[in-house]
Amino acid sequence: MENVRWGRRIRAFRRLKRLSQVELAKEMEMSVSILGQIEQGKRVPSERQLDKIASLLDIPIEELKGEIKAGE
């Protein structure tokens, strides 16, 4: 269930930034397929990947992890 939560949050923040899967995958230097698997909860992102996703989406890693609410 944790994997699905990660994926949903990543997808939601990606969409808020108006990035396609293709664009984010390219910036992440990973395939669209792997990013899709992460967003679907079928693959667990590594800490390095989470840090890079948070950086690219310009959000604190704690917000991506769901540890703080937006705007705090």
Region roles according to the model:
Residues M1-L16:
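A short, Lys/Arg-rich alpha-helix, primarily the initiator
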Residues R15, E29, Q40-K42, K69:
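Residue-level detection of the helix-turn-helix DNA-binding "recognition helix"
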Residues R15, K26, S55:
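Alpha-helical residues within the helix-turn-helix
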Residues R18-Q37:
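Short alpha-helical DNA-recognition segment
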Residues R48, S55, I61-E72:
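Short, charged recognition helix plus adjacent turn
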